[in-house]
């Protein structure tokens, strides 16, 4: 009888320990799922434009995992969409503190500084992003934009060319190259670049508009009218004064 009781107690203890271990694993699994669920809720909220809810969900993730770089990055983006510049910058810097090799954090910092008109700081951040990821197309493009704002046309052109060198079908890069050639008074090269942008993205409104202006300069008025009309259909507001100048050629 005592032997049976002894075995019963041992078995009961083993079952209890197994139950505890299983419970711990379940709790860990629930915690991991909960983080992903909060991420999904945050993503869905941001897609709907409900930024307050998105911020709240990312903050819940960070309470569970304070060093979750993805949550800090996404929270920064949400703050940026809310116009909360200081909080946005703070989150991107927190990402860099956690992992200094996340190129997107530097890129987003560059975007934030650029929007504030802090061009030198934006330039530095884009360069840091490119040091980590030399094939970061958008960083090359945005660095080109900074150089253009600083009236450094050759440097801007170089960055845009690097972007299309990485991704030949990058329509924005071809459009920006066309804009540089336009400013350099190289009309033929500008037109070729705008046309290439439209081959990739036929409804690129800005490229249609740019071609309309370029063809007007070349006195190819039918083509100017064609692209001006297409620009309007693609969602851009064409300068009424420009349309007035085209009227005699319709």
Which role fits each region the language model picked out?
Residues 64, 98, 132, 166, ...:
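Structural marker of alpha-solenoid helical repeat scaffolds
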Residues 9-18:
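Bacterial N-terminal signal peptides
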Residues 47-60, 82-94, 104, 115-128, ...:
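Structural signature of tandem alpha-helical TPR/SEL1-like repeats
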Residues 36-47, 70-81, 104-115, 138-148, ...:
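Conserved alpha-helical positions within TPR/SEL1-like repeat arrays
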Residues 20-34, 209, 213-250:
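Terminal, low-structured helical/coil segments at or just beyond the last alpha-helical repeat
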Residues 103-104, 137-138, 171-172, 205-206, ...:
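Boundary/linker segments of alpha-helical solenoid repeat arrays
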Residues 20-59, 63:
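N-terminal leader/linker segments that initiate helical-solenoid repeat arrays
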């Amino acid at each position: 009888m005592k032997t049976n009781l002894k075995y019963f107690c041992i078995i009961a203890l083993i079952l209890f320990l197994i139950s505890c271990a299983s419970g711990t694993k379940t709790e860990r699994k629930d915690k991991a799922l909960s983080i992903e669920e909060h991420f999904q809720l945050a993503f869905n909220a941001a897609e709907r434009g409900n930024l307050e809810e998105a911020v709240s969900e990312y903050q819940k993730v960070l309470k569970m995992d304070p060093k979750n770089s993805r949550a800090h990055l996404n929270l920064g983006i949400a703050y940026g969409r809310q116009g909360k510049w200081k909080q946005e910058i703070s989150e991107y810097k927190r990402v860099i503190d956690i992992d200094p090799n996340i190129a997107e954090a530097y890129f987003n910092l560059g975007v934030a500084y650029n929007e504030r008109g802090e061009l030198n700081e934006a330039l530095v951040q884009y360069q840091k992003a490119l040091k980590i990821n030399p094939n970061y197309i958008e960083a090359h493009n945005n660095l080109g934009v900074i150089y253009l704002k600083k009236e450094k046309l050759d440097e801007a052109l170089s960055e845009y060319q690097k972007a299309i060198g990485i991704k030949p079908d990058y329509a924005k890069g071809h459009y920006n190259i066309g804009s540089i050639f336009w400013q350099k008074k190289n009309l033929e090269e500008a037109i070729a670049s705008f046309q290439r942008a439209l081959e990739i993205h036929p409804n690129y409104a800005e490229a249609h508009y740019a071609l309309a202006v370029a063809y007007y300069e070349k006195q190819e008025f039918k083509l100017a009218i064609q692209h001006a009309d297409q620009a309007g259909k693609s969602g851009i507001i064409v300068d009424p004064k420009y349309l007035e100048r085209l009227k005699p050629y319709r």
